[in-house]
Design a protein with these regions (language model features):
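Short acidic capping loops at alpha-helix termini that bridge into adjacent secondary structure
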Residues: 26-27, 61, 87-92, 130-134, ...
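Active-site groove signature of glycoside hydrolases
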Residues: 124-145
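Short, acidic/polar
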Residues: 40-52, 111-127, 175-179
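Conserved beta-strand positions
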Residues: 30, 62, 96, 134-137, ...
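N-terminal binding-site loop/beta-alpha segment at the start of enzyme catalytic domains
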Residues: 1-92, 158
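Alpha-helix N-cap and loop-to-helix initiation/capping positions
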Residues: 40-44, 72, 76, 107-115, ...
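Beta/alpha (TIM)-barrel catalytic core signal, keyed to glycine-rich beta->alpha loops juxtaposed to Asp/Glu
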Residues: 2-12, 141-329, 341-344
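N-terminal small/glycine-rich loop or linker at the start of catalytic domains
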Residues: 19-37, 95-108, 131, 136
Length: 344
């Protein structure tokens, strides 16, 4: 049966301007980091993407290494584009990234022009696209001049492979340098993608959040649910099909008794707001307008629907924020800290 998206999809979502650019992103975007590799049935992937678009989620975020195996998420999304979204390409924002290991040898990762351009070409081929809307440097490369990496992004945009350039997990200092280089080249940095959630607030400590506001660069926060910790999933133990059980970027050692007790308190605050814990966690990331979009992952369509519902209440009282701060102790869950380091 031919897929027909919900007619009221744009009424279900809030759209925010990405920095000072003309690009608007949905307040909730869908990331394909997990659950889009060979370990997930194709029909499940299609159902997740359909549910997202039906709820006004127009932004689909990928990277060359997403899988497993690396590249398989882009292959899967390319099939879904052809099967379900072929007539809606101009309604979609598709992004990809390059920075992590993809092939053997010295040119298979990091930030050289050689790797960045080849990676973009491979991503386009896997997805069957002429261009992506956003292409990112996935991580800072301490061994490649920043001018070279940003020059590669400039070339990728100027050659028509991407419409916008972005960076991911760069700290405040490196972000200022990267943005200045891109501005000089005439291809502005439109967006930054850092990890950010109640339990991982490095963007506040580092000053990155303020830096992005000062520079007029948009932001999309990945892991707003702390890899699933900020949901009800782990309140009663570790489910067999969960990330923690499978050691997928969340480890059982992170879920101590004290951590789970605090998450239960956060869940009570969410219930008082008539939200699920996931919805409140997303709303918290989006509070005050400092973050353009929250980038979610999902293993089933119902999770997409739940997360999209966060836009129904993005406001917090001072009392709610104080209570959240009381129980949302920062945990050592920033797996990307090394990518954000200043030292070279």
């Amino acid at each position: 049966m031919t897929y027909v998206p919900a007619k009221d999809r744009y009424e279900r979502m809030v759209y925010r301007r990405c920095g000072r650019s003309g690009l608007k992103l949905p307040a909730v975007s869908l990331g394909l980091w997990h659950n889009f590799g060979h370990d997930t049935p194709h029909d499940t992937k299609r159902a997740i993407c359909r549910a997202a678009f039906d709820h006004g989620i127009t932004h689909f975020d990928l990277a060359n290494n997403y899988g497993p195996p690396p590249g398989s998420a882009e292959h899967a999304f390319g099939s879904i584009l052809a099967e379900d979204f072929a007539g809606y390409r101009d309604e979609l924002i598709v992004s990809s990234k390059a920075g992590y290991g993809m092939w053997p040898g010295p040119y298979g990762e990091w930030g050289s022009r050689k790797y960045m351009v080849a990676s973009c070409d491979q991503s386009l081929k896997r997805m069957g696209l002429d261009y992506v809307d956003i292409f990112y440097s996935h991580r800072f490369d301490p061994d490649t001049p920043l001018e070279e990496t940003m020059g590669a992004l400039d070339y990728i945009v100027r050659s028509g492979r991407a419409l916008y350039a972005g960076i991911s997990s760069y700290n405040s200092e490196r972000t200022r340098e990267a943005v200045a280089i891109l501005n000089d080249l005439g291809t502005p940095c439109v967006i930054h993608q850092p990890s950010y959630n109640m339990l991982n607030r490095w963007v506040e400590r580092d000053g990155l959040k303020e830096t992005l506001s000062d520079l007029g660069v948009g932001s999309i926060a990945f892991t707003p649910l702390a890899q699933g910790m900020l949901t009800k999933k782990y309140l009663g133990g570790i489910p067999d099909d969960s990330r923690a059980a499978q050691d997928k970027s969340l480890f059982p050692s992170m879920l101590t008794e004290d951590v789970v007790a605090n998450i239960r308190k956060l869940n009570e605050i969410a219930e008082g707001r008539d939200q699920t814990l996931a919805q409140m966690a997303i709303a918290w990331v989006l509070r005050g307008g400092g973050i353009t979009s929250a980038l979610i992952g999902a293993s089933k369509p119902s999770q997409v629907e739940d997360c999209a519902g966060a836009v129904g209440n993005l406001d917090f009282t001072d009392e709610e924020l104080a209570l959240i701060d009381q129980y949302a102790d920062e945990e050592q869950i920033n797996l990307w800290a090394k990518s954000s380091e200043t030292d070279t």
